[in-house]
Amino acid sequence: MSWNHQSVEIAVRRTTVPSPNLPPGFDFTDPAIYAERLPVAEFAELRSAAPIWWNGQDPGKGGGFHDGGFWAITKLNDVKEISRHSDVFSSYENGVIPRFKNDIAREDIEVQRFVMLNMDAPHHTRLRKIISRGFTPRAVGRLHDELQERAQKIAAEAAAAGSGDFVEQVSCELPLQAIAGLLGVPQEDRGKLFHWSNEMTGNEDPEYAHIDPKASSAELIGYAMKMAEEKAKNPADDIVTQLIQADIDGEKLSDDEFGFFVVMLAVAGNETTRNSITQGMMAFAEHPDQWELYKKVRPETAADEIVRWATPVTAFQRTALRDYELSGVQIKKGQRVVMFYRSANFDEEVFQDPFTFNILRNPNPHVGFGGTGAHYCIGANLARMTINLIFNAVADHMPDLKPISAPERLRSGWLNGIKHWQVDYTGRCPVAH
């Protein structure tokens, strides 16, 4: 069934939803908002007044979608319900990214269906079964000692520099090195991964506006396919060889599937973990008592609180394959539902004192790795380990780190990113504040 702007408007008017106190025309995926701040107060207003709210969008201003808008989902339990019902709420229909450039061509949205994030069963089930081989506790555990050594080196080199951009010198390095180690990518090529992922996700940011994200994606896929060809000729004891060989149940990834898997790793793995690290350090700078506690205790619970607090993916979307009632609100077939993880992770009905950064928080049922179900983050354990290792290294080598300037935010309607953050690693800089 096709939904145009008018038919969606009629369906929305027939559904009784409270009206929150928001500025006229407010759009929760507007990248201009996130370039300046997070809409913390607006999310709180929705959770209180209209947890499931129709976010209308004018034609031509829907970030690549021309359906009149979407349902904004702001409470944690609703996010989890949508995530559990992948038979009702499709990742494939419109993809999971809720915001692109307004003038993006529909075929450029649809091509992203080749990435596992944007698949439904049974194709998603098959791919995830194969790819999960690389993320077993044993596979991740084998990286621990090497990544611990690398984390210490990263922090020591940054500390020796005295000051600099925390994002480029610290945050991005270990996630990139973890991915490089997992895939067997030469460490000297990790800079390419960094730039390709920036260019693919920052297409609405002025810093990357001159770059064609399709070209960056094509370069990365080409790089990955060449790597797969090399491993096919010269097998090794690594995850790439396992993924492209039919050594388990006769299943393997095609060259195309492997290429798009690397795209997913570069974005979903690298971008999210590095933004968690940056915003975790920002949180420690704003909550020095928690930093003192971390330096003394190094609690395992810290990584999950950092991910909850940062929520590096602001939102993903699904599309309803049939009519569905969600917490009393009628979702119509064809309508998009955008799960705002950033709001859900501060749900007052789930978290005690949600606006308190508490690295001992336990339990911590956040959705920073996705709601639950088929699309829960396959690399969550690797991300936790990476976060723990880098903060241990920062605590060892630059325990008195202080900000020099305010962070520069990424202009994105779905990714909570920090592009640059100047810091003094010694804590002695007189202009630090």
Swiss-Prot record:
UniProt note: phenotype after gene disruption: Cells lacking this gene appear to metabolize cholesterol normally, probably due to the ability of Cyp142 to compensate for loss of Cyp125.
One GO term of the biological process aspect: biological process involved in interaction with host
Enzyme category, top tier: oxidoreductase
Induction: By cholesterol.
One MF term in the entry's GO annotations: iron ion binding
Gene3D superfamilies xref list: Cytochrome P450 (1.10.630.10)
Keyword annotations of the record: Cholesterol metabolism, Heme, Iron, Lipid degradation, Lipid metabolism, Metal-binding, Monooxygenase, NAD, Oxidoreductase, Steroid metabolism, Sterol metabolism, Virulence
Pathway: Steroid metabolism; cholesterol degradation
The enzyme's E.C. designation: 1.14.15.29
Domain of life: Bacteria
A Pfam match: p450
Residues that coordinate or bind heme: 377
Cofactor: heme
Binding site for substrate: 202
Enzymatic reactions: cholest-4-en-3-one + 6 reduced [2Fe-2S]-[ferredoxin] + 3 O2 + 5 H(+) = (25S)-3-oxocholest-4-en-26-oate + 6 oxidized [2Fe-2S]-[ferredoxin] + 4 H2O; (25R)-3-oxocholest-4-en-26-ol + 2 reduced [2Fe-2S]-[ferredoxin] + O2 + 2 H(+) = (25R)-3-oxocholest-4-en-26-al + 2 oxidized [2Fe-2S]-[ferredoxin] + 2 H2O; (25R)-3-oxocholest-4-en-26-al + 2 reduced [2Fe-2S]-[ferredoxin] + O2 + H(+) = (25R)-3-oxocholest-4-en-26-oate + 2 oxidized [2Fe-2S]-[ferredoxin] + H2O; cholest-4-en-3-one + 2 reduced [2Fe-2S]-[ferredoxin] + O2 + 2 H(+) = (25S)-3-oxocholest-4-en-26-ol + 2 oxidized [2Fe-2S]-[ferredoxin] + H2O
Role: Involved in the utilization of cholesterol as the sole carbon and energy source by degrading the side chain during infection. Primarily catalyzes the sequential oxidation of the terminal methyl of cholest-4-en-3-one into (25S)-26-hydroxycholest-4-en-3-one (alcohol), (25S)-26-oxocholest-4-en-3-one (aldehyde), to finally yield the carboxylic acid (25S)-3-oxocholest-4-en-26-oate. Also able to sequentially oxidize cholesterol itself, not only cholest-4-en-3-one.
Family, per entry: Belongs to the cytochrome P450 family.
Protein name per UniProt: Steroid C26-monooxygenase
Organism: Mycobacterium tuberculosis (strain ATCC 25618 / H37Rv)
